[in-house]
Curated annotation (Swiss-Prot):
The light-harvesting complex (LHC) functions as a light receptor, it captures and delivers excitation energy to photosystems with which it is closely associated. The keyword Thylakoid applies. It comes from Pinus thunbergii (Japanese black pine). Chlorophyll a 6 binds at residues 246, 255. Chlorophyll a 4 binds at residue 217. Belongs to the light-harvesting chlorophyll a/b-binding (LHC) protein family. Chlorophyll b 5 binds at residues 165, 262. This is Chlorophyll a-b binding protein type I, chloroplastic. Chlorophyll b 1 binds at residue 58.
Length: 266
């Protein structure tokens, strides 16, 4: 009896001594898991003015009748959905992913349309700096020389470029959607980890603000790309050359002047 009591007392004492350490371990593990969960699933920072019911709306104080399904949970939600395209949660999730991906491509595309032409205007020699004419250089005798330097790797086959693009982009997109050793279990739109080497999204509040900036700049870039396409069709010039022409003679070179004189096919 005494022996059993001693063993029981010893067991209780041991549990008492171990409990603080166990609690501390559980606390640390729980904190780590919470950080991982937050890093992977955080959608917004409640403190940000761009989220929640009091976020800015598309018509400011005159915005009435905001759809109930637009709660301000996601970045770029200004409460505007007159066609109710986001009413279905699955459709909304799909469209949101499509928008973010297109925003990123548009930002890269807008930079690619402007930057080479801007460099060419400042003395850097290109074979062809205008974005919608550059690709046609692959059909020339020497192929497409990068930066106008024939000593660099150059492209001579449109089929080879197409195949490389399909294969490489297909692998990257499949990896993003399906996950892999670097992206498994992470948000496909914001995987973080190895895809965020600078740690820009480590802070949830900063990440929420960056998401808003990304979607706003991406939407602007998509409109810019649309404008570049229209400029190419109407004027046959690149965006920088069109800008220079407009600054030189704003009256003769503007959207209204081209719209009133434009004849398709001429």
């Amino acid at each position: 009896m005494a022996t059993a009591s001693a063993i029981q007392s010893s067991s209780l004492a041991g549990q008492t001594l171990l409990r603080p350490q166990q609690n501390e371990l559980v606390k640390k593990v729980g904190t780590a898991q919470a950080r991982i969960t937050m890093r992977r699933t955080v959608r917004s920072a409640p403190e940000s003015i761009w989220y929640g019911p009091d976020r800015p709306k598309y018509l400011g104080p005159f915005s009435e009748g905001t759809p109930s399904y637009l709660t301000g949970e996601f970045p770029g939600d200004y409460g505007w959905d007159t066609a109710a395209v986001s009413a279905d949660p699955e459709t909304f999730a799909k469209n949101r992913e499509l928008e973010v991906i297109h925003c990123r491509w548009a930002m890269l595309g807008a930079l690619g349309c402007v930057f080479p032409e801007l460099l060419a205007k400042n003395g850097l020699k290109f074979g062809e700096a205008v974005w919608f004419k550059a690709g046609a250089q692959i059909f020339s005798e020497g192929g497409l020389d990068y930066a106008g330097n024939p000593n660099l790797i150059h492209a001579q086959s449109i089929l080879a470029i197409w195949a490389c693009q399909v294969v490489l982009m297909g692998l990257i997109e499949g990896y993003r959607v399906g996950g892999g050793t670097l992206g498994e279990g992470l948000d496909p739109l914001l995987p973080g980890g190895a895809f965020d080497p600078l740690g820009l999204a480590d802070d949830p509040e900063a990440c929420a603000e960056l998401k808003v900036k990304e979607i706003k700049n991406g939407r602007l870039a998509m409109f810019s790309m649309f404008g570049f396409f229209v400029q190419a069709i109407v004027t046959g010039k690149g965006p920088i050359e069109n800008l220079y022409d407009h600054l030189a003679d704003p009256v003769a070179n503007n959207a209204w002047a081209y719209a009133t004189n434009f004849v398709p096919g001429k």
